[in-house]
Amino acid sequence: MKRTDYINWDEYFMGIAILAAKRSKDPNTQVGACIVSQDNIIISTGYNGMPKGCSDDEFPWDRRGNTDADTKYPYVVHAELNAILNANGRDLRGSRIYVALFPCNECAKAIIQSGIKEVVYLSDKYADTMMNLVSKRMLDAAGVRYTRLNTDIGSLTLDFVAEENIKK
């Protein structure tokens, strides 16, 4: 008889996005994204971080500074955009993107332009901000669905064990 306590596809792909977020060097906000084809094949992942070639040690991670250039905001590439760029030109039309935090307006534009048709997210903590409302307006106009993932899973544990310890 097969197991019945396995996670569903949405939980699996959101788990991949959350795991990708663990790669972020941002001390305040770690976001990951996972792009999935219509037939549940992972196309790409990404997380928020500095652009390739820009040292994580030489660019600021601060939220506040003397000028905007002294903050992380003009430099950091968001998880959604990194996942789209990491797809390296693969066709994303009709795909889904899983992301822990609802996309900002800039990421919403990239999602729309790339042909992604659904956003699955966990948190909408900036729901009342103008930029979040702008994101939703654009996604609605472009016919991109967005759905908050409702799950009763509080957490998942990754066990790194030697192969000989895995149940057969």
Which positions does each model-derived feature cover?
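Zinc-dependent deaminase catalytic domain
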Residues: 1-168
